[in-house]
Amino acid sequence: MIRGSRYELSGKELPRFLPWVREMLECDVHPGNVHQPQYPTSIPESHVQPEFFAALEKFLRSNQIDTSGETRLRHGHGHTQEEMYSIKYTRLGRIPDVVIYPEAESQVTSLIEVAKAHNVTLIPYGGGTNVTDALRCDEREQRTIVSVDMRRMNRILWIDRENMMAAIEAGAVGRHIMAELRKHGVTMGHEPDSVEFSTLGGWIATNASGMKKNRYGNIEDLVLDVTVATADGKLERTSASPRESVGLDLRRLMFGSEGTLGIITSAVVKIFPLPEVQRYGSVLFPTFEAGFKFMYDLAREATPPASVRLVDNLQFQFGLALKPKSSGGLADLKSKAEKFFVTRIKGFEPFKMVACTLVFEGTRGEVTRQESDLYRIAARHGGMKAGAENGRRGYQLTYSIAYIRDFLMNYYIIAESFETSVPWTSALALCENVKRRLTDEYARRRLPGKPFVTARVTQVYRTGVCIYFYFGFYYKGIPNPQEVYLELENIARDEILNSGGSLSHHHGVGKLRRAFLPRIMSDTAIQWKRGLKKSLDPRNVFGAGNQGLDG
């Protein structure tokens, strides 16, 4: 049971989940077999020069400076499985020495000047949701490390309804942006899975993608201008125009910069009227291949809805296992009748069928037209409408996945997600190749039970798709399971690249994938990036070290 009340699964009994996990992984998962967390683990001491503190106190209040152990620990990691395992069971070798909470752009620029004067390194912090080791501190770093938590810079500075733009501070969290804009009848439309906790600055720094990009675009489509505090001063412009041809666009340097070039302080973004209609939907397909062909035709022949996702059979079963305890009576009867119709009348095989979940947004006319086109194309590929409620539930489950992952770690199960983008012609083979490679490698190492390997197509483009993988296994008896997992994930990443996929669609590079950069870009490209870093930040004030850009 997930505690609290924020999520749809909160407070609900899930009687089928652990038995399903036990059967699927072929492992000894039960309430008496628990790996008890040791949080908080050993916390490294803080080392801050008195002179640096004295300089900070000239422009910051005492409640903007925090050296407490747990605060520093929380700012020293993201959400990779390795980081979660470390804070639960071992330790992080290096964490920030101090956390600073600026409340104005002037304080950010003053902080950078003080950091330069006292040879201190700065790591920007948004929501802490990254899964690339982007926040992990280098254990070799001898300088004082400052985590710059931007979340107090969270204001919407202005809204222009006539030109449909808004200026927002970089520390604003996604759910707060949505709530504030809604008061004015508008939305930004950017909803990554981490929207509850991630920030506008983090979205830009990681070049993020949202689940509704089909309607609103990815972050690079939404941001019109960005203001950045750098080691040399402020990067800003006088206006935000619809489009410009003014030479090299320095704003674009910040997309995917991952904290290595400066601190994003605000951005001007596009906004949209709140949709007149929002509807969910879902479609069942007899096989993953049939569902994939449907998505291909949908991208070619129609306007895809705000979001469309296709999950494979194992992920479909995972969702069924998370259904709450039934109230009995008519609910049970309805469920049995639906299962009978799908498997007996329609002939769908339980261990081959897959599901597609949908979100439609727009005017009533737009949504009606999209639904008509989509369900017509789905029927051509053997698809069967499965109702709005199943679609809504599928998207709500998105927000609980991280908690389920962390819950399962207590039962000796380690798991993580990784993603890629790939042309249509290589996508199906890539899915199969990655699943086969991981399964074979797992067996070769004689690890316990069976691995959990599943995939979903989570974004569609005219030229290809984004594919999201989940991988996990039972780790009891495996020494250093987080390292074993990382080795296997790197093997999966190797197979992704061999199969024509990208290094990342929206998670980014961080430190987790920097070793793969020579596989995807030329030596000249890498040297240009390093040269840019040395030119803009010669003293490596922004010392996150992501992408190998460490001065």
Where are these regions (language model features)?
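Glycine-rich N-terminal segment of FAD-binding domains in flavoprotein oxidoreductases
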Residues: 47-53, 57, 66-151, 170
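Extended, charge-enriched "interface" segments that sit outside catalytic cores
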Residues: 1-48
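Activity-critical C-terminal alpha-helical subdomain
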Residues: 234, 509-551
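FAD-binding subdomain of flavoenzyme oxidoreductases
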Residues: 154-311, 323
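C-terminal substrate-recognition/cap domain of FAD-linked oxidoreductases
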Residues: 11-31, 62-86, 292-491, 499
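Glycine-rich tight-turn/loop motif centered on a GG-T
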Residues: 97-99, 141-145, 165, 414-419, ...
